[in-house]
C-alpha cells in the first residue's frame, strides 16, 4: 500500500522537490550577486609595497593579478611605476567600463619592471592592475601612481 501511495503521488513529490531545489538555487544566486568587487584604493604620489600571491586574481595564463582603485580627473597625466625583484611585472590602467586605457610590460630601463604613462580623458574611478607576466606566481612588488605636473612652457 505504501508503494502504491508513493507511485500515485510521485509527480507531486517530484514537483515539490524541484520547487525546493529551485528556491535554494535562487537564494544562492542572490547571495553571490550581493558581493561587490571593490579593490583597495591607492592615492597618487604614495608608494605602496605589497605581495602578489596565488590567492589573487587568476589571469588564465598561469599567473595572478591584483587590482587597486585610483580616482583620476580629466586632464591628469599619470605615471604608474611597478617594480619587483621577484617577477616580470606588467601594469594596466583600466577604465570603469572595463576597457584597457594603457598597459606596459617592460620599462625603458631594460629591466622587467613596468612604467606606464597616460593622459586621462574622463574623470572617474580607474583600476591599476598589477600582474605577473606569463606563468609566474608572483612575489613582492612596489607600486606608485604619480600625477605629473603639466609643462608650463
Regions found by a protein language model. Give the residues of each.
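Non-catalytic extracellular/lumenal accessory regions of secreted precursors
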Residues: 2-4, 24, 28-69, 74-76, ...
